[in-house]
Amino acid sequence: MAKKVFVKTFGCQMNEYDSDKMVDVLNAAQGYEPTQDVEEADLILFNTCSVREKAQEKVFSDLGRIKHLKARGVKIGVGGCVASQEGDEIIKRAPYVDVVFGPQTLHRLPELLAQREALARPQVDISFPEIEKFDHLPPARVEGASAFVSIMEGCSKYCSYCVVPYTRGEEVSRPFDDVLVEVAGLADQGVKEVTLLGQNVNAYLGKMGGTAEVADFALLLEYVADITGIERIRFTTSHPNEFTQRLIDAYARIPKLVSHLHLPVQHGSDRILMAMKRGYTAMEYKSTIRKLRAIRPDLAMSSDFIVGFPGETEDDFGKMMKLIDDIHFDNSFSFIFSPRPGTPAASLHDDTPHEVKLRRLQELQAVINANIKSISESRVGTVQRILVEGASKRDGSELMGRTECNRVVNFAGHPRLVGQMVDVTITEAKAYTLRGEVVTADHGALAAH
């Protein structure tokens, strides 16, 4: 009987990708199969995130909840960014943990588990061995028509509030050919949509075929678009400073590049942006969006916002709200500033009451939610191209898929539509989703009847 591994993932899409790779590595090396039931697992892994406040305490709290499972011989591992930050401290506080590993050493999981058995003591490896992990990962196993592909690791921007360079290392790009081989392999398995991942994906500079030449992100997009079977290309996360004219022009050259962009701005006040060490002004950010929308007028924008950064005044907050009004964001991920240990911003004087920060966050989210509602309602009556992902979470008898602009659409349809591209007429706008009716279906798949 195959051993079972349960993986709990916290945080970003990079972590989702890494969690899938953990399962692939363990399956190839030791025959582990994934399970969604922690009670039947032989191995439990937490893939952690340290971006938000109290992330470490959350991990130790969750570890405490599964400690009782050690009685039947379950192995426990902690990976991800909290593992990188805490290292041996995790073993000191939770000595029942068997292995601790960082984002760059997940490929060593089978080896670490074997050493845990042989040496009868916990193993810790949170080193940064460049891009080595990608050389040791088995071919991806995918289910469905959409997949993530990591093209680079780390970040070299060192924004004053951000812990990523310290937990994932500086920017290292995967070789150009390696990325294309992975995407082509996914296309052979029926994947139609790929999301290219990196902490700063548009800073990509991949070596080409063992030569001294390097490919930038715009060139990588062109080659990915040429791979047979790939119909949609997404990417996240990008940095405004690396949004070059070549990358902007790619939106004119590459129809497969979706009209949806997540481009974190973080704030709308130049004073706060400077304190954050973001390296651009609000006007420069808006200029990039204007250029993009000159090419793609229907480009949907989402972003990240930090409210209550140390020293933020009502005037600063007002400038952020004006930027939101100017851009008309389609969605956002917005948070109250939380100091991360070891970052420059953690030592900044912060005298803004929490109640004020909370009020500002609520105001910001109210405006974004109004934008979401308005944009969703404007889609009613239009025909949207949908990639069908599977059963609807609202109603298992229906299907769900995503528009090019990343809106979830629920609709009645035959299960054979899963994995296909279909045209759907939008009939109703819900709070965060749309409803629709199938118009056509590719490849002879059947609409509901």
Swiss-Prot record:
<feature type="binding site">
    <location>
        <position position="159"/>
    </location>
    <ligand>
        <name>[4Fe-4S] cluster 2</name>
    </ligand>
</feature>
<dbReference type="InterPro" id="IPR005839">
    <property type="entry name" value="Methylthiotransferase"/>
</dbReference>
<dbReference type="InterPro" id="IPR023404">
    <property type="entry name" value="rSAM_horseshoe"/>
</dbReference>
<keyword id="KW-0479">Metal-binding</keyword>
<dbReference type="InterPro" id="IPR006638">
    <property type="entry name" value="Elp3/MiaA/NifB-like_rSAM"/>
</dbReference>
<dbReference type="Pfam" id="PF04055">
    <property type="entry name" value="Radical_SAM"/>
</dbReference>
<keyword id="KW-0963">Cytoplasm</keyword>
<feature type="binding site">
    <location>
        <position position="81"/>
    </location>
    <ligand>
        <name>[4Fe-4S] cluster 1</name>
    </ligand>
</feature>
<dbReference type="GO" id="GO:0035597">
    <property type="term" value="F:N6-isopentenyladenosine methylthiotransferase activity"/>
</dbReference>
<dbReference type="InterPro" id="IPR007197">
    <property type="entry name" value="rSAM"/>
</dbReference>
<keyword id="KW-0819">tRNA processing</keyword>
<keyword id="KW-0408">Iron</keyword>
<feature type="domain" description="TRAM">
    <location>
        <begin position="377"/>
        <end position="440"/>
    </location>
</feature>
<dbReference type="GO" id="GO:0051539">
    <property type="term" value="F:4 iron, 4 sulfur cluster binding"/>
</dbReference>
<dbReference type="InterPro" id="IPR020612">
    <property type="entry name" value="Methylthiotransferase_CS"/>
</dbReference>
<feature type="binding site">
    <location>
        <position position="12"/>
    </location>
    <ligand>
        <name>[4Fe-4S] cluster 1</name>
    </ligand>
</feature>
<dbReference type="GO" id="GO:0046872">
    <property type="term" value="F:metal ion binding"/>
</dbReference>
<feature type="domain" description="Radical SAM core">
    <location>
        <begin position="141"/>
        <end position="376"/>
    </location>
</feature>
<dbReference type="Pfam" id="PF01938">
    <property type="entry name" value="TRAM"/>
</dbReference>
<feature type="binding site">
    <location>
        <position position="155"/>
    </location>
    <ligand>
        <name>[4Fe-4S] cluster 2</name>
    </ligand>
</feature>
<dbReference type="Pfam" id="PF00919">
    <property type="entry name" value="UPF0004"/>
</dbReference>
<feature type="binding site">
    <location>
        <position position="49"/>
    </location>
    <ligand>
        <name>[4Fe-4S] cluster 1</name>
    </ligand>
</feature>
<keyword id="KW-0808">Transferase</keyword>
<feature type="domain" description="MTTase N-terminal">
    <location>
        <begin position="3"/>
        <end position="118"/>
    </location>
</feature>
<keyword id="KW-0004">4Fe-4S</keyword>
<dbReference type="InterPro" id="IPR038135">
    <property type="entry name" value="Methylthiotransferase_N_sf"/>
</dbReference>
<dbReference type="GO" id="GO:0005829">
    <property type="term" value="C:cytosol"/>
</dbReference>
<protein>
    <recommendedName>
        <fullName>tRNA-2-methylthio-N(6)-dimethylallyladenosine synthase</fullName>
        <ecNumber>2.8.4.3</ecNumber>
    </recommendedName>
</protein>
<comment type="function">
    <text>Catalyzes the methylthiolation of N6-(dimethylallyl)adenosine (i(6)A), leading to the formation of 2-methylthio-N6-(dimethylallyl)adenosine (ms(2)i(6)A) at position 37 in tRNAs that read codons beginning with uridine.</text>
</comment>
<comment type="similarity">
    <text>Belongs to the methylthiotransferase family. MiaB subfamily.</text>
</comment>
<dbReference type="InterPro" id="IPR013848">
    <property type="entry name" value="Methylthiotransferase_N"/>
</dbReference>
<dbReference type="InterPro" id="IPR002792">
    <property type="entry name" value="TRAM_dom"/>
</dbReference>
<dbReference type="InterPro" id="IPR006463">
    <property type="entry name" value="MiaB_methiolase"/>
</dbReference>
<comment type="subunit">
    <text>Monomer.</text>
</comment>
<feature type="binding site">
    <location>
        <position position="162"/>
    </location>
    <ligand>
        <name>[4Fe-4S] cluster 2</name>
    </ligand>
</feature>
<keyword id="KW-0949">S-adenosyl-L-methionine</keyword>
<keyword id="KW-0411">Iron-sulfur</keyword>
